[in-house]
Amino acid sequence: MMQIFIAGAVAFLAAVLFTPVLIRKFSDEGLGQEIREEGPKSHLKKRGTPTMGGIAILVGITLGYIVAVLVGLVFTGSGPGVSGWLVLGLTLALGGVGFADDYIKLVKGRNLGLNARAKLICQLVIAIAFGVMILQFPDSNDITPGSTYLSFVREMPTFNIAVGGAVIGMILFLIFINIVISAWSNAVNLTDGLDGLASGVTAIVMGAYVLITFWQFRNSCADGAAAGCYFVRDPLDLAMLASAGLGACLGFLWWNASPAKIFMGDTGSLALGGLVAGLSITSHTELLMIIVGAIFVLETVSVVIQVTYFKTTGKRVFRMAPIHHHFENGGWAETTVVVRFWLLAALAAMTGFGLFYGEWLTATSF
C-alpha cells in the first residue's frame, strides 16, 4: 500500500515541477502547436501553445514507479516484478513514437509528422515485441504477465485466442495484442482535443486501475489458491504503475487545464494509450477496460461513424468528430464539455470497478 501512494505522489511532483520547465524551453524555442483551419474556430487562439508536454508525463510515470520499487527493496526486500517493467517499456516506447512524430512536425516543419506507414510499422514492432515478452517470464506459480485467454474481469477459459496450433495460435495472439495496443493508443490520441480532456479522463481510468490491481494483489493466487483469487503476475507492480500514471496525469493537468499552458502532444497521448492497453492486458481485464475507458471508446466510435457515413452518403452524423467537437460546435463552452466528459468518465470507471468487485463477491460466496 505504501509503495502505491509513493508512486503517485512522486509522479505528481515530478510532472507538476517539470512541466513548467518544458513550457519555458519550448516557448523560447518557438515550438508551438499548429491549429488546423478546419477545426473549431475558437481553437485558433491556441496556435503557438507549447506542445510535447507528454515528456513530463513520461518522466513522472518513470520516476514514480522506480522510486516506489526502490522503497519496496529497502523496506520490504521485495524486488520489482517483470510485469511492471514490460508495461513501462511499452509506455515509453509508444511515447518515443509520439515524440518522433511531434519532433518532425515542430522542429523539421513537416506538418503531418511521421507518415502513416512509418507510424504503423513502429507501433506494429513495439506491439509484437510486447506480445512475445508477456508470454515469457513465468513466476514460481507458472503465471506469466500475459495470457492467451480473452479476459473480462478475469480470464475466460472458454475463449483461448491462440488456437490452431503453436504457430497459428501465436500469430492470432499477436494480432489481438496489436489491435488492443493500436486501438487504445489511437483512442487517447483522438480524445486529446480539448484542454485537460485526455489527461483528466486518463487520470480517472488510472484511478480505477489502482483499485482493480490492488484488489488483485490482495487476492492473488500466488499467495495460495482461494475462491475468487486472481492469476495475475505482479499485481502490486501494476498498481504502482497505475498510481504513477494517475499522479503524472494530475501533475500535468495542473498546467494543461483550460486555458492550457502546454499540450501533451502525441508524445503523451500515444504513451498514455500504451499504458492503458498494457494495464488491461497484464491485469487480464481487456474487455473490462472498454467499460472503464468508455470515453475513449466513445471518441473513437464517433470518428468511425462519421467517416463511414460521410464516405457512404456524403453527409455527416455529427457537426464535427471526435464527438467532443460536436458538443463544442453546438454551443457548449470548452470547459463545460471537458467537465461533463470527466463526470461521464468517472461514472464509467465506477461502473467498471463495480462489475469487477461484484464478480469477486459472486466468486467468493459459494
From Swiss-Prot:
Protein name: Phospho-N-acetylmuramoyl-pentapeptide-transferase
GO cellular component: plasma membrane
Record membrane topology: Multi-pass membrane protein
Family the UniProt entry places it in: Belongs to the glycosyltransferase 4 family. MraY subfamily.
EC identifiers of the protein: 2.7.8.13
Protein keywords: Cell cycle, Cell division, Cell membrane, Cell shape, Cell wall biogenesis/degradation, Magnesium, Membrane, Metal-binding, Peptidoglycan synthesis, Transferase, Transmembrane, Transmembrane helix
Primary role: Catalyzes the initial step of the lipid cycle reactions in the biosynthesis of the cell wall peptidoglycan: transfers peptidoglycan precursor phospho-MurNAc-pentapeptide from UDP-MurNAc-pentapeptide onto the lipid carrier undecaprenyl phosphate, yielding undecaprenyl-pyrophosphoryl-MurNAc-pentapeptide, known as lipid I.
